[in-house]
A protein has these predicted regions:
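Short beta-strand segments enriched in hydrophobic/aromatic residues
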Residues: 19, 72-74, 106-109
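Hydrophobic/aromatic beta-strand elements that line small-molecule binding cavities or substrate pockets
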Residues: 3, 38, 54-60, 72-74, ...
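Short, cysteine-centered beta-strand-loop-beta hairpins and adjacent loop/turn segments enriched
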Residues: 75-84
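Beta-strand residues in well-ordered beta-sheet regions across diverse protein folds
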Residues: 26, 69-71, 103
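Short beta-strand edge/turn micro-motifs at domain boundaries
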Residues: 86-113
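Short, aromatic-enriched amphipathic alpha-helices that serve as compact interaction elements
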Residues: 1-10, 18
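A solvent-exposed, acidic/Ser-Thr-rich amphipathic alpha-helical stretch
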Residues: 12-62, 83-85
Length: 116
């Protein structure tokens, strides 16, 4: 939930703390972003997050690794248009000396037509 709040606030410092420097993030558009691309695209780009809600959250923890799956509803503004879409999300988190950090994420294709 801290990641969702950081996205909506465009809080670059918080995202840098939450995301692992070796991050590999696959977007629903099938683009694979590294750490710098992910942070910049979510805090300085044309994409503005308004809200993100997670439903049916499931977490499995084994030692210093956690896998989260959820249905996610994203509310964003892109190119001046308000959009809302729902995707299946998988994240892998690892416990580090700095706390839990997201090492990888994958957002599936949006379900249903975008609203907005």
């Amino acid at each position: 939930m801290r990641r969702a709040a950081a996205l909506a606030a465009r809080d670059e410092a918080a995202l840098r703390t939450l995301m692992h420097p070796a991050l590999q993030w696959t977007t629903f558009r099938n683009d694979v972003l590294g750490y710098e691309e992910y942070v910049a695209g979510n805090t300085r780009g044309e994409l503005m997050w308004r809200a993100q809600r997670l439903d049916d959250v499931r977490v499995t923890v084994v030692a210093d690794t956690a896998v989260l799956t959820a249905w996610v509803t994203d509310e964003v503004t892109r190119d001046g248009r308000d959009l809302e879409f729902r995707v299946r999300l998988t994240q892998t988190w690892v416990r580090t000396e700095q706390g839990w950090r997201c090492l990888s994420g994958h957002a599936g294709a949006p379900v249903g037509p975008p609203a907005g």
